[in-house]
Swiss-Prot record:
Species of provenance: Listeria monocytogenes serovar 1/2a (strain ATCC BAA-679 / EGD-e)
Protein name per Swiss-Prot or TrEMBL: 3-isopropylmalate dehydrogenase
Cofactor: Mg(2+); Mn(2+)
Gene designation per UniProt: leuB
Keyword Oxidoreductase (UniProt): yes
Quaternary structure annotation from Swiss-Prot or TrEMBL: Homodimer.
Name of the top EC class for this enzyme: oxidoreductase
Function: Catalyzes the oxidation of 3-carboxy-2-hydroxy-4-methylpentanoate (3-isopropylmalate) to 3-carboxy-4-methyl-2-oxopentanoate. The product decarboxylates to 4-methyl-2 oxopentanoate.
Pathway(s): Amino-acid biosynthesis; L-leucine biosynthesis; L-leucine from 3-methyl-2-oxobutanoate: step 3/4
Amino acid sequence: MTYKITSLAGDGIGPEIMTSGLQVLEAVAKKYNHTFEIESHPFGGAGIDVAQDPIPSSTLKACQDADAILLGAIGGPKWDNAPKRPEDGLLALRKALGLFANIRPIQVPSSITHLSPLKKEIVENTDFVVVRELTGGLYFGEPKHWDESAAVDSLTYTRAEIERIIEKAFEIAATRNKKVTSVDKANVLASSKLWRKIAEEVASRHPDITLEHLYIDAAAMLMIQRPTTFDVIVTENLFGDILSDEASVITGSLGMLPSASHAENGPSLYEPIHGSAPDIANQNIANPMSMISSVSMMLRQSFSLFKEADAIDAAATRTMQAGFLTADLGGNTTTTDFTNEVLKQIEGGE
């Protein structure tokens, strides 16, 4: 079968780690006899440079026509004063594709537990997923206004928006440890009261999955105190933005973690959680793990190529266990050498 993928390398370290990700994809294609048609297009600052737009029309069309999209990283000081910033392109892409669910898996490999800011006995065996709603809440609610004397943001959610994101969380939990933690502020916010009610309704349709509710402040504390207690966390846009970034710090490096954004229909977007890191761009020292893991996540969630995704994950784990660690993990392995070892492990693995 042929899979059509749009590659958006972006800015900063994006092109370097995208090269790593695509090399891994090519290795999988060769080993398991798949065909991946890859189209590369400018996006973010690179889009501004060539078309004065962070998401040129040709890039958007390629994304809409793809089976899945890989994104490296966007942004940098070069475009801080541009009429349209690189980040505007990502918001536009999410809207155009109808991406409503951001999925961020949080795992701490045993080879790097010492890098976590948490004690080893707290962080060991951490394995949970944050499911964040992307289309509603304070970021998009109207009215939205500010001037020198006052400002207003609106936290708005519809039943349909809440129900589909909570259903997505239960769908994911069904493939894991069958527990969903719904995070809200139902003791204060009207939107959270509706959120909690709908969560209970969805849970009633999934009797084999446990639902618990936590207020956002309690969830933020528990994530640090006992991260292993979580399986799938689901929450609204602002809370999800904060919690997913808090969760990412548990691993000790942003260079480790992938994410996925899903629509109800159409292609999904896979990307590392970190930024473009312009300070280390073009030095061959960026950690490509988050991009490699994004490729694995794409194979698993968009194409149901589970064996192939497992092969990538196992190869990356063996690479780190063998001592191939980039600078952010306390080592001195280059981007190229890390990638080459992963490729070697894929080729020689089961």
